Amino acid sequence: MLEKQDRFSRYDPGKFRRRFRVLMWIVIVSLSLLTSRIWYLQVVKGDELRSQSENNRVRIHEVKALRGIIRDIHGKAIVENQPSYDISVVPGAVKNVGDVIRVLEAIYGNQGMEFRRDVSVSEKNRPFIPFKLAKNVSWEELALVETHSLDLPGVVVDVVPVRKYLGGEMTAHVLGYVGEVSPEDLNGDQTGTLKPGDRIGKSGIEKYLDEYLRGENGGEYIEVNAVGRKVKTLRRVEPIPGHDVTLTIDAELQKVAWEAMDGKVGSVVAMDPRDGAIRVMVSRPAFDPNLFNKGMHPDAWKKLATDPMRPMENKALSGQYPPGSTFKIVVAAAGLGEGIITPETTFYCNGLFRLGNHEFKCWQKKGHGRINLHKAIVESCDVYFYNVGKMVGVDKLAEYARAFGFGAPTGVSLPGERCGLIPTGEWKLRKTGEPWRPGDTISISIGQG
C-alpha cells in the first residue's frame, strides 16, 4: 500500500502534458502528410491514374478492315481474304515481355516457332496495344497457347485477315503482295493514316491501288480480367471494307502463258488489239506472294532478293531488252513517212548485206530473193530493213520510234515500269565520246544493238 502511494507521489503532470503534446504533433503531421498525399493523387495525378486504371481494365482492340477482292476480267476472284491467327502480347500488362517470350519458347519446345523480340518501341509508345510475336500460326500451335493461358498473362490471340493469292506464283508480279509497314513507309505516309503494325501493298496492283483496296479499320473496347483475358465487349466500331477491283487480266489465258514459259526466263504480255487491254502479263521466274503472310525470315528474304534469276522483278515492266524484229514496223513507217520507200519498193536479199568491209547476215541464210515491203514484213527479212534503215538514218528512226511510244512509259497501272532507250548520234557521242557510225544504224534497223 505504501509502495503504491509512493508511485503516485512521483507522478509529474507537466511531464505528461509535454509527452501528450509531442504525440499530438506526430498525429497531426502524419495526418497532414496523408491528406496532402491523397490530395496529390486525387487532384494532381487524378486524370493520369484514372487513365492507367482504365487501361488496366479496358483494352482498345483494333478490328482490321477486309481488303477489297481482286477479280479478273470475267469476275473470277484471284485474290481473297482468309483469317490469320496471330499470337500477341500487351506489353503494359506484363512485367517483362522477355520472360513471356521465354515461356512461349519453352511451351513450343523444338517445333521451330520463332517469336519477335523487338518490342521496345511498342512497350514505350503503345504499352496497351497488342504487339505481334508470331503470325499465321496453325490450329495446333494456337491450342498450346490456350492450354497454357494461366502461364501467359498479357498474351492474346488476334484474328486478322490476310491475303490469299489463288494463282500463287502465276499472278505474283501483276498482283504484288501485302506486307507490314516499314519505318520508310511511315515516314513517307502523306495521309497520316498509317501506324506500326499496319499491312499495306508492297508491289503490283496491291501497291498501286493500296488506298482504294485497304478500307478503314474499326475497333472494340473490351473489358479484361487480371491476366489480360477478355471479359466482355463494351463498344464496337465496325470496320469499313476496301473496294473490290476488276482487272483486264484473263486468268485462263494467264495460266496458258504461265505454263508455256515453264522452265524459261522472260515475260509474256498479250494485249487485246481492239482496245489495248492487257489480258496476260507473265514474268518468270516468280515468287509466291502467300509466303509474306507469315512474315518472311531475313535469310529467306535475302535469298529471294539476291537470286541471280531475279524472281522478284517483273520482267514485263522492269526488264530492258532489244525489241528485235518488232522494231521493223517502226523502220517501215519511217521509210514510208519520209517518202524513201513505197509499198512496192523492192530489195534483193541473198542472205547478206555488205557495208564497207562488214557483212550483216539475214536470219534466212539462203536469202529471200527480191521482195517488196509486204513480203519483207511477213517473212521478217533482215536485209530489206538494213537497206531502209540505212537510207532513213538514225535520227529519223529515233523520231519515229518515239512517235510509236518507245522510250516512254506506257502508263500501265503498275509500279516499277522502266522506259527503254532510243539511241541517237548525239546520245552516243555524249555517252561514249565516239561518233555514230553507219554500222550502228544497220544493227538498230532490226531492233538489235
Describe each PLM feature range.
Residues 1-298, 308, 320, 342, ...:
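Periplasmic/cell-envelope proteins involved in peptidoglycan metabolism and beta-lactam response
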